[in-house]
């Protein structure tokens, strides 16, 4: 029969001990390491009981106080409902809003509907790692950005004080699409001789204006006022006014001459039009460019360049010819960081573009 515990020790929970000087210690049964708890018996017993529950429950146990407090907390999924309304109030384009919604849907699938303050960096990192492991680093990067923005809005409304996304690593997505050089442009342009006449004109206009294919297809003659082509970019909503006196010296392209040819040869309501003088879709333009690229006989490392690469080529040529700031304005980018993604060689006011 074991030695009877003293009166002071008789009612203590397992792993809690009292020293002769009345000081309480908790001994971790896994390691034998002791932790001091002070001389307050009631507090020491409460701490020891909670520690025993945490160590031996076999699952993540949430303290009663945390459960009580969480009744007044906003959960992640309910906050995402609120975040969707915040996005809608920003006045962003429908296409951009749809892209946000797809990321929010992925977040709902990947994270529990727990109180915002209980969502951990570890849980977020695990979700993002799942995408990276599947070779979807670009998706992981976009989801992380959306989730971080959602938590920033929650902080702004006072629901939480820290952003658990901030400590996660941003996924590095490798862009595999090849850049297009000026010489390669000329070879594809030459190969496009057998294509419909509008393809060459679309290529010229893409390089001299630096705009996306979707915006090129939407350009109308009525958008030209007092020597400026007014473009509201469909992707970002950025409004820019491009001087029709622009020219790309490296390729011998004059915007005025290209516009004159479009009016004389195509003669549609839109600047780029089909042989029937009807508007063209971005898919049609991109598809015919792909055919001309294949006909050129050029080979590329990585994914071959699409029509979109003419925008990057434009930025790089204007950077050399005029300045990087000019290229940034022309592309409609808000930050130097984003503009540099297009300028590198890969190895609700109108912004009036001025040639300086």
From Swiss-Prot:
PANTHER family: PROPHAGE INTEGRASE, PROPHAGE INTEGRASE INTS-RELATED. It comes from Enterobacteria phage 434 (Bacteriophage 434). Belongs to the 'phage' integrase family. Integrase is necessary for integration of the phage into the host genome by site-specific recombination. In conjunction with excisionase, integrase is also necessary for excision of the prophage from the host genome. Residues 74-155 form the Core-binding (CB) domain. Keywords: DNA integration, DNA recombination, DNA-binding, Hydrolase, Transferase, Viral genome integration, Virus entry into host cell. The keyword Hydrolase applies. This is Integrase. Residues 175-355 form the Tyr recombinase domain. The keyword Signal does not apply. The active site is at 212, 235, 308, 311, 333, 342 (o-(3'-phospho-dna)-tyrosine intermediate). GO terms for molecular function: DNA binding; hydrolase activity; integrase activity; transferase activity. SUPFAM superfamilies: DNA breaking-rejoining enzymes, DNA-binding domain. InterPro entries: CB (IPR044068), DNA-bd_dom_sf (IPR016177), DNA_brk_join_enz (IPR011010), Integrase-like_cat_sf (IPR013762), Integrase_catalytic (IPR002104), Integrase_lambda-typ_DNA-bd_N (IPR015094), Integrase_recombinase_N (IPR010998), Phage_int_M (IPR053876). Its EC number is 2.7.7.-, 3.1.-.-.
């Amino acid at each position: 029969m074991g030695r009877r515990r003293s009166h002071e020790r008789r009612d203590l929970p397992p792993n809690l001990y009292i020293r002769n000087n009345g000081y309480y210690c908790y001994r971790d049964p896994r390691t034998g390491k002791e932790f001091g708890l002070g001389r307050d018996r009631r507090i020491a017993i409460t701490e020891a009981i909670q520690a025993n529950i945490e160590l031996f429950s076999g699952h993540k146990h949430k303290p009663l106080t945390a459960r009580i407090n969480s009744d007044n907390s906003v959960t992640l999924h309910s906050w995402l409902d609120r975040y969707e309304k915040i996005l809608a109030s920003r006045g962003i384009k429908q296409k951009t809003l749809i892209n946000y919604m797809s990321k929010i849907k992925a977040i709902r699938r990947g994270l529990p509907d727990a109180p915002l303050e209980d969502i951990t960096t570890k849980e977020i990192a695990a979700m993002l790692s799942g995408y990276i492991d599947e070779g979807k680093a670009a998706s992981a990067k976009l989801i992380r950005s959306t989730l971080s923005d959602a938590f920033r809005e929650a902080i702004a409304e006072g629901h939480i004080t820290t952003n658990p996304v901030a400590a996660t690593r941003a996924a590095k997505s490798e862009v595999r699409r090849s850049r297009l050089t000026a010489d390669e442009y000329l070879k594809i342009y030459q190969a496009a001789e057998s294509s419909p006449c509008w393809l060459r004109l679309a290529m010229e206009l893409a390089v001299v204006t630096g705009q996306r294919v979707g915006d090129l297809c939407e350009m109308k003659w009525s958008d030209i006022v007092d020597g400026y082509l007014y473009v509201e970019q469909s992707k970002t909503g950025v409004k820019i006014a491009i001087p029709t006196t622009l020219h790309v010296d490296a390729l011998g392209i004059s915007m005025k001459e290209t516009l004159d040819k479009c009016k004389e040869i195509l003669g549609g309501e839109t600047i780029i039009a089909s042989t029937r003088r009807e508007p063209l879709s971005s898919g049609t333009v991109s598809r015919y460019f792909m055919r001309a690229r294949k006909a050129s006989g050029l080979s590329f490392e990585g994914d071959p360049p699409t029509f979109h690469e003419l925008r990057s080529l434009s930025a790089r040529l204007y950077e050399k010819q005029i300045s990087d700031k000019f290229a940034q304005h022309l592309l409609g980018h808000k930050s130097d960081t984003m503009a540099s993604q297009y300028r590198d060689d890969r190895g609700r006011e109108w912004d009036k573009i001025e040639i300086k």
